[in-house]
């Protein structure tokens, strides 16, 4: 017969406290507005930091000079950040349904050498912020995300949320991560 051993379980518990700042500004990419550069420099690590910007392409119709402004901002603040690329993506739920787009973003993050000390800036509505957040959270053990919501709904939902999700297998928000933003800029 097998002798039954009785023992008390070892129970482990941990808590993770995390905070991030939400800043309100205008003309985020104006060269004289140092907010974005200040937020990146505040991590206390030596710079410049690699930064990829992923932007809802619907914004470009209303702000045709935005990509040029982002490039100029990167040049003006090159002591703090190195702009590796700006990637326009289609907005809305279509971006969260496209596994190929997410894989392409992750491949781009790898190709430009982003790591967990780098930043991805997501600019757009809630669906784009969710998709970009998911791609960043699942690449290289998590790449820091700065969210820039451009709709009222995104400001109140994904712009300040803790989850990043994509749609898969015909189900909305099936794949999800819990990963807080490094910062929110609104």
Task: Please report, for each region that a protein language model flagged, where it lies by residue.
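ATP/NTP phosphate-donor binding region
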Residues: 2-118
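Short leucine-rich amphipathic alpha-helices used at interfaces
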Residues: 6-7, 130, 174
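A glycine/threonine-rich phosphate-anchoring loop and its flanking beta-alpha core
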Residues: 23, 30, 137-186
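Short, flexible, glycine/charge-rich loop motifs used to bind or transfer phosphoryl groups or to couple energy/partner
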Residues: 41-42, 110-111, 135-136, 173-175
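Hydrophobic/aromatic beta-strand patches that form the interior of the parallel beta-sheet core
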Residues: 52-54, 85-87, 121, 146-148, ...
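Surface-exposed, flexible loop/turn segments at secondary-structure boundaries
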Residues: 59, 128, 153
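Short glycine-/acidic-enriched loop or helix-start segments at secondary-structure transitions
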Residues: 63-65, 131-133, 157
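A short, small-residue-rich loop immediately preceding and capping a beta-strand
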Residues: 112-150
